[in-house]
């Protein structure tokens, strides 16, 4: 008995339709993280892509960024986040294609 790949694909699609939670658990969103001023100095880059599960927050993205760029811990307590050019709390939901800016403390004189 030969396996029919089309039948297997159809069965998998039906299973995903029957269980949207399982399908959502596998869904990922890509967020572009932007680094400014001291954050850029600490990372050595102006931007980096981050992929997180659908339903993630700005804080989830930040956790991934901090894991990838541990030197950012130096400014962690004073940084501000902006999601799509609007200041945002860490519990703000992120979506595919969003931009998350890490804004370090600003000083002047």
Curated annotation (Swiss-Prot):
The GO terms describing molecular function are: molybdopterin synthase activity; nucleotide binding
Q: According to the UniProt record, list the residues that bear Glycyl adenylate.
A: 109
Localization (cell): Cytoplasm
Give start-end of the signal peptide.
none
Q: Which is a Gene Ontology cellular component entry for this protein?
A: molybdopterin synthase complex
Q: Quick one: where is this thing mainly located?
A: cytoplasm
The UniProt entry, under NCBIfam families, shows: moaD
Subunit info?
Heterotetramer; composed of 2 small (MOCS2A) and 2 large (MOCS2B) subunits.
Function, please? Acts as a sulfur carrier required for molybdopterin biosynthesis. Component of the molybdopterin synthase complex that catalyzes the conversion of precursor Z into molybdopterin by mediating the incorporation of 2 sulfur atoms into precursor Z to generate a dithiolene group. In the complex, serves as sulfur donor by being thiocarboxylated (-COSH) at its C-terminus by MOCS3. After interaction with MOCS2B, the sulfur is then transferred to precursor Z to form molybdopterin.
Record-given protein name: Molybdopterin synthase sulfur carrier subunit
- What organism is the protein native to? Oryza sativa subsp. indica (Rice)
Lineage here is: Eukaryota, Viridiplantae, Streptophyta, Embryophyta, Tracheophyta
């Amino acid at each position: 008995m030969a396996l029919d790949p089309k039948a297997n694909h159809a069965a998998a699609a039906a299973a995903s339709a029957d269980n949207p939670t399982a399908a959502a658990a596998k869904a990922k969103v890509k967020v572009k993280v932007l680094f400014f001023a001291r954050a850029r100095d600490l990372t050595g880059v102006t931007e980096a892509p981050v992929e997180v599960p659908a339903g993630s927050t700005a804080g989830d993205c930040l956790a991934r960024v901090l894991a990838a760029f541990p030197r950012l811990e130096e400014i962690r307590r004073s940084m501000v986040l902006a999601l799509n050019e609007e200041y945002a709390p860490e519990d703000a939901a992120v979506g595919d294609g969003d931009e998350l800016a890490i804004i370090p403390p600003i000083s002047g004189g």
